[in-house]
């Protein structure tokens, strides 16, 4: 048996950052430390007024560009007719005489105006700050009524789909492992975890995920990463266990290689 110890950490940790500036108009009841949310759920909302006005302005400019294009198409058609009255082939007409550059400019203005509308729409959407995944808030930096600038961290969150435990293994520990443990065959290997939850001793079952394949300089150890799924809503073999909270310190053990010519002896009383 190989034993080690480690701390439960989230697999995914995120700083939620505002991409727009403005005053926070509302926050979710779940926007508190420990608040649990689902992917896509609204966490907070920045005042959208300036961005609504910007979108309206962009849409108005687009309508103006569309009107200008209609006008330019009519002038271009009239220029072609006037050229045809001369009796000369249309292929001999200068581009300026047919207003081709003006028509191209009007079409380009349409594309630019559409891009500005899309940009304004995206900015408006970003006033609604939603959860990127199912998770929990571990730190909040702002609250309702506060002005925030673009790039300001609003909160720190972590995902609750998986947690990981990094287990340091010394050379002595590694010598107890089988050759297959250093290959992809390691993945999914059962790892027993023991720790405290709600003041009581608890146990969980995890699965080996990967070796980090780097020797830590401080302790000359390699790290085995163990994964536990749905730690805050345990299922399967862990369905009767207490939630495995981020930050919990656990002791882990798993079966190593079988040693030949070794027998278990009963301890004398």
Q: What are the language-model segments listed below?
A:
Residues 2-3, 60, 64-68, 72, ...:
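Extended amphipathic alpha-helical segments
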Residues 2-61, 132, 136-144, 150-152, ...:
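Long, amphipathic coiled-coil "stalk"/hairpin helices in large membrane-associated assemblies
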Residues 160, 179-205, 215-216:
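Low-complexity, intrinsically disordered
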Residues 200-263, 267-268:
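Structural microfeature recognizing short secondary-structure transition sites
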